[in-house]
Amino acid sequence: TQTSHPAKFHVEGEVYCNVCHSRNLINELSERMAGAQVQLDCKDDSKKVIYSIGGETDQDGVYRLPVVGYHEDCEIKLVKSSRPDCSEIPKLAKGTIQTSKVDLSKNTTITEKTRHVKPLSFRAKTDAPGC
C-alpha cells in the first residue's frame, strides 16, 4: 500500500528596493535587497490565516520558503526591510498592501516543487538620481 505523505513545496521569489519613489513598478534602477523579511499566509474560506511561514532574502535578494501540505488562497507579503532608506511598503489603489499570490492548492496544473512568485519591492524614501 502507498503511504500518504503531505505535499512539500518551496515558494521562491525576489525582493527589491525600488529606488524611484515616484514609480510603483520594479525597473532597471531597482536593487535586489538582501536581508528583507517576507511572510507567506494561506487563508481558509472565512479569510482566517491557517498556515503561515516567514523567511528572509539571501545576499541576492531571493527568498525560498519551505511549505508542507496543500493550501488555498496563499500570498506572500513584505514584512520588514533591511534598508532604512528603502522601507516603505507600497500601497495599492484601495489602500491594501502589495502582495504576490501563489497557487499551493491540490487542484492545479502546476507540477513543479518550487513555486515562483512575482517580485515584491520596498520603496525608497526619495528618488535616486536617474529616476
UniProtKB/Swiss-Prot annotation:
InterPro entries membership: Pollen_Ole_e1_allergen
One Pfam family per UniProt: Pollen_Ole_e_1
Single GO term (MF): zinc ion binding
Post-translational modification: Exists in two variants: glycosylated and non-glycosylated. Carries a complex, major N-linked glycan, with a alpha-1,3-fucose residue in its structure and probably also a beta-1,2-xylose. The average modification of molecular mass due to glycosylation is approximately 969 Da.
Subcellular location(s) per record: Secreted
Impact when changing residue 58 to G: In Pla l 1.0102 and 1.0103
Keyword Secreted recorded: yes
Paired cysteines (S-S): 17-86, 20-131, 42-74
Residues given in the record as Zn(2+) binding sites: 21, 45, 73, 88
Residues modified by glycosylation: 107
Annotated keywords: Allergen, Disulfide bond, Glycoprotein, Metal-binding, Secreted, Zinc
Domain of life (superkingdom): Eukaryota
Cellular component annotations (GO), alphabetically ordered: extracellular region
Family: Belongs to the Ole e I family.
PANTHER family xref list: OLEE1-LIKE PROTEIN, PROTEIN DOWNSTREAM OF FLC-RELATED
Name of this protein: Major pollen allergen Pla l 1
